[in-house]
Design a protein with these regions (language model features):
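Structural motif
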Residues: 13-18, 40-44, 87-89, 231-234, ...
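Substrate-binding cleft of carbohydrate-active enzyme catalytic domains
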Residues: 84-86, 91-225
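Catalytic-core regions of glycoside hydrolase
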Residues: 62, 196-263
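Contiguous, structured surface segment used for ligand recognition
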Residues: 1-79
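Short, solvent-exposed polar/charged micro-motifs at secondary-structure junctions
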Residues: 19-22, 166, 237-241
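A structural signal for isolated positions on well-ordered beta-strands in alpha/beta enzyme cores
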Residues: 38, 155, 190, 226-228, ...
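Short coil/turn connectors at secondary-structure junctions
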Residues: 7-8, 34-36, 79-81, 110-111, ...
Length: 263
């Protein structure tokens, strides 16, 4: 694609299709023919993805001439959340690693990065109630900006279940921590209750906290994505009917629940 006087036109327009798939966020139709290039998109994410495809299709020969194949590509996502969870134990990724990951996700049309390294003490115990120090807070801001530039939703997760007290004070502590992260630019949030036992693993208490956050934060803050939760029992092999029944009956249906399947 060039601005040279002899260049063929590049046309960008809103997609006009009866196909419901092409109306999903990130969908696009790319047409390359002898008359030029036309990109029809559903939203800005679709335009970004079409640009990635153009770059991936371009071939440059030994003389520096770049060509594109002729054809029509209809591309749309089948899965709403496409990405990774940094939720492992051990040394977390470095800041540079995360930046590199976010750029890779954009190129591969992945739209979700969930920040939840278990060895980040401000994500989990003992410091989940406290604000991030200045350096780490600045890095979170950088990650949010880089994610947005690559059309990736940066989801910040909290993991309070190891030492949470089911009190009004700790409920407000979670709410306040979400507010701190919102002020750093975060607009997507998750609560993780995995890898815990005892008091923190009570389904009714978890649902009560999540419903509180849904009402007092998610529904009140501008531009916030649906709340995500990871249950303590997140697959069929580990899950007891009592735990899942409580969540199913009491959890606000607007909250998205992570589930890994049979195992």
């Amino acid at each position: 694609v060039t601005s040279h006087s002899e260049a063929l036109p590049l046309t960008i327009k809103q997609i006009d299709s009866k196909d419901s798939e092409l109306k999903r966020s990130g969908a696009y139709q790319l047409t390359i023919d002898p008359k030029g290039i036309e990109i029809a998109v559903s939203d800005s994410r679709g335009l970004f993805y079409a640009a990635q495809t153009l770059q991936q299709l371009a071939q440059t020969d030994g003389q520096g001439n770049t060509t594109l194949p002729l054809g029509v590509i209809k591309d749309y996502p089948d899965i709403a959340y496409r990405g990774t969870v940094e939720g492992f134990y051990g040394d977390p990724w470095s800041h540079a690693d995360r930046i590199e990951q976010l750029r890779f996700y954009g190129k591969m049309k992945m739209n979700t990065y969930i920040y939840g390294p278990k060895d980040d003490p401000y994500h989990s115990s003992p410091n989940w109630r406290k604000p991030y120090p200045e350096k780490e807070a600045a890095q979170i801001k950088d990650l949010v900006k880089e994610a947005a530039a690559n059309k990736v939703d940066f989801v910040w997760a909290i993991h309070p279940g190891l030492d949470i007290k089911w009190t009004d004070e700790d409920r407000i502590n979670v709410l306040n921590k979400f507010g701190m992260m919102y002020d750093l630019g975060v607009r997507s949030f998750a609560v993780f209750f995995d890898d815990i036992s005892g008091e923190g693993a009570k389904a009714d208490k978890q649902a009560d906290l999540l419903n509180f956050l849904q009402k007092e934060f998610i529904e009140k803050k501008e531009g916030v994505s649906p709340l995500i939760m990871c249950p303590t029992e997140y697959n069929r092999a580990w899950a007891g009917s009592d735990y899942l029944d409580v969540l199913g009956k009491t959890l606000d249906p607007a909250i998205h629940v992570m589930w890994t399947g049979n195992s």
